[in-house]
Swiss-Prot record:
It is found in: Cytoplasm. It comes from Leuconostoc mesenteroides subsp. mesenteroides (strain ATCC 8293 / DSM 20343 / BCRC 11652 / CCM 1803 / JCM 6124 / NCDO 523 / NBRC 100496 / NCIMB 8023 / NCTC 12954 / NRRL B-1118 / 37Y). Zn(2+) binds at E185, H246, H262. This is 3-dehydroquinate synthase. Pfam families: DHQ_synthase (PF01761), DHQS_C (PF24621). Catalyzes the conversion of 3-deoxy-D-arabino-heptulosonate 7-phosphate (DAHP) to dehydroquinate (DHQ). It catalyses: 7-phospho-2-dehydro-3-deoxy-D-arabino-heptonate = 3-dehydroquinate + phosphate. The gene is aroB. Its EC number is 4.2.3.4.
Amino acid sequence: MSTITVDLATKKYDVKIDNTLHTRLGQEISAVWSARKISLLTDSNVGPLYLKDTAKQLREVGFDILELEVPAGESSKSLSVAGELIAKMAAAGFTRGDGVIALGGGVIGDLGGVVASLYMRGIAFIQIATSLTAQVDSSVGGKTAVNLGNTKNIAGSFYQPDLDLVDVTYLNTLTDRDLVEGYAEVVKTSALANQDFFDFTGQIKSVADIRHHAQELSKRAIAYKASVVMADEKEAGDRQFLNFGHTFGHAIELLAHGELRHGEAVAIGMIAISSRFEQHGIMPRGLTTELLSRLEAVGLPTHSHFIGTTDFFNHLINDKKNHDGILNLVALEKVGQPIIVKKKIADMPAFVEN
């Protein structure tokens, strides 16, 4: 087992990475939490696979479990669903001494974090990440948010967990598409981190390779993200680098109305922004091709007809990274050296179209 400690000014917690954690959840969680009520939150995809066994393990070590299941998908990542969950917890008599465990992927992690942060102004929170996206990215660092209308992640807060459990065995029940979606975030992280990690993703030539190397990929991605979060918890500086590909990606994801997964949209966003930065001499020639080869090797999409449309630019205007008409976009001077490039919203059509 690998343990990566996230040591922040206000909190310290471990991210544990292994392939047998699912067999000792009660042991791991009871080492961090005393006996209490737990709201065990999952979705309709993960629930049938893991909810009953997880609840059983937790009850065996003395926890009182409220099982909560929501429909799978982005539609559950809303204030209305969060409110319904909070109401159920209140009806069950939850107090400030109780906790929330998110058992699932990125949507459940976000939703669970929001619920934990809001209930009685904040109760304890643990992540059990079951998707590659959640394991390597969204479960680490404390970002929690829900969507409002057509704006992603607009309502939320930074709310760190007490523990983050990453068991790559959960990935065995993911479809190839679900797994590959998360791999887009791994490629992103490898480009931001260092040449050694980037070379490693260059060796991944198939979905089978992702599955075979999942634990090492997760460990490297989490180690990099943890280092960034420890240096900049609230995204005032270097944590913005983790948004590489996301400004364009979020717009594309919203315009696709569910036809594209988050990681697929991020893959498209990375190529779209990188190719334009190359054309403007901000990124080195050939780096876009290297990113492209890693993404296409596992079947990720890399182009979208939405880029450059009026609706695309409207979503950029509404992006939460828009500060007074200026977007902070992430580029790479070279692998391992990300930078922020400020672009006026008014200049984006010319930048994108050229």
